[in-house]
Structures are given as C-alpha cells and as structure tokens.
Amino acid sequence: MVSLSKIAECRLFLSELMPHKRIILFERLFKERLYIKQKSIMQTFKEVGEEWNQTLYTTLLKYLGSTHNGSAMEQLSRVATYAMIAKERSEQRTLEALLLGSAGLLELYPDDGYIKMLKLEFSHLAAKYQIKPMSAEAWQLQNIYPNTHPTLRLVQFAASMHREPISLGTAMACSTRKDVHNLFSGCASEYWLERFYLGRDKVEAASRIGSFTGDLIGINVIIPTLIANGLYMEDKTLISRAMVLAREIPSENNRYTKMWQSGNNPISISCVDSQALIQLSRTYCENNLCESCIIHRIDSIR
C-alpha cells in the first residue's frame, strides 16, 4: 500500500530538485522501465523464431488489442503472420480479408456483397497459406470503447500497412513524433466505419489511428523495439535515436503524472518523464521499496 504522506514528501522533493538532477534521475528511471519492456520484446523475438518484423508486428497487434483483446491479437499475429501480411499488402481489401478472416471475425457480419467478396478472398488465402482461423469467441466485442474495437483496429492497421509497410526498417526511420504518426495514418473505409460495431446502428469512431494512440504506440512499441534491436545488434546509434524520439513525444497525462505534480510548474514534459514516474510509482512506491529507490541515492547524481 502506498503511503500518501510519503508520496507527498517525495513529490515536494522532486518539485524542488535542481532541473539537471531531475533530468538525470528521470532518465535512469526511464531506462529501468525500458529494460522491462525490451525483455518482453526479446521474449517475443525468441518465440517467433528470431524474426524482427514478426516481433514488431506481434508487439504492435497486442498493444492495439488493449486490455480486453491483447491476447487474442497476439494469437492472431501468429495465425496471419507478418510474412503473409507483407506479401499481400498491395490490396487493402486483401489485407482486410486476411486479418478479419484469420481472426474469425468475418463470420459475424451479415452477408452483403462486400462481406461475401472478403469471405471468398479469404477462402483462397486460407488455402494458399494453410490458415486455421481463430474462433470469434476469442474476442471481447461488447462493452468496449468503439475506438478499441478489434475489427476497427484491424482495418485501420490494414489501411496503414497497405499505404506503407510497417516494418523494423520503417520503425528505425522514425526520428520524430510526426514520423510515428505517419506510419499509422492509413484510413479505414466508410464501409467499416458504419458497420464494425455489431448491434449498434451508429457509432462515432475515427477512420485512422489518432495522434493520442500514435504517441502511445511510439512509447510502448516503437521505442522499446528499437532499444531491444539496438542492444541485440550492439548498435549504440540506434539506442541514441530511440532516446531522441522519446524526448519528442510529449508526457502522458494519467494518474501517475497527476499524482506527482506539485504546483503550477509541470515536472513531466516528455514521455521520458511520464514513463519515469510510472516506473517510480509501480516498482518502488507501490511495493514500499523506499530504501532501494533512486531518490534515496540522489546525492550520487552529479
């Protein structure tokens, strides 16, 4: 249990800390958090046969699945693999058929002309790649935010992948926040925007992955993958580039950043800072590891 009085004491301390020391402290905490994330990515890397594009794809789909459908998205990435997606990306409709058919989601939609066309296309793809589709029961489709609905996320991803290949190479080329947003700027068709949420007549949803989610993909997928690859390849330049990108992405605004804010001067400017505060809260404060916390070793920072 977090001691609120202790949090208040440390919050005041951080707000009064010399800016250069706070920057160093937050970078250390940020790197601790990155280490945890890159360990998870390296585990995925081993599970998928040490293939970096598949690793990025699996990590991305799992993140797009959010809390409710992350596991199902991860499973889908192994049914419709990156190699299949990359080979079929010339047609957006083909990618929709491959992803939604493999997910078992196509079967849920009424058989109008477009769905029949996608089902026919998927039958050819399933035979070509020997795909065994998932069950639709693997997915949570009700009582979720429309913008996190798996059908919408998959057709948004299909549109982005059709527009430009989402690969380790294109991720490595991201040096700014705008580069990350551009990577996911493909637009889902009006057809899906009007029909993706079964059981609802009209649902407000974005045609493409927005800047808010784009930032979170940068924080939780792109940057950790670049760090993992940089460590694996012993490429310090790539690690430095990932850190520069992290400084480009603004701070998250969540309960952790709010908890540590003191006064009117924000202490969390970039995602380096907000991720550092998450690491501080989850690893040290919530486990009462005050003696192990870097704040107690602040005098060692120069």
Question: Which role does the model predict for each range below?
Answer:
Residues 30-274:
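Hydrophobic, aromatic-lined core segments that form the binding pocket/scaffold
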Residues 14, 24-25, 36, 244:
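Sequence-pattern detector for short linear motifs
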Residues 1-21:
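Compact, glycine/acidic-enriched structural inserts
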Residues 19, 23-26, 30:
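Terminal, positively biased "leader/anchor" segments
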Residues 263-302:
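Acidic, carboxylate-rich catalytic segments that either coordinate divalent cations
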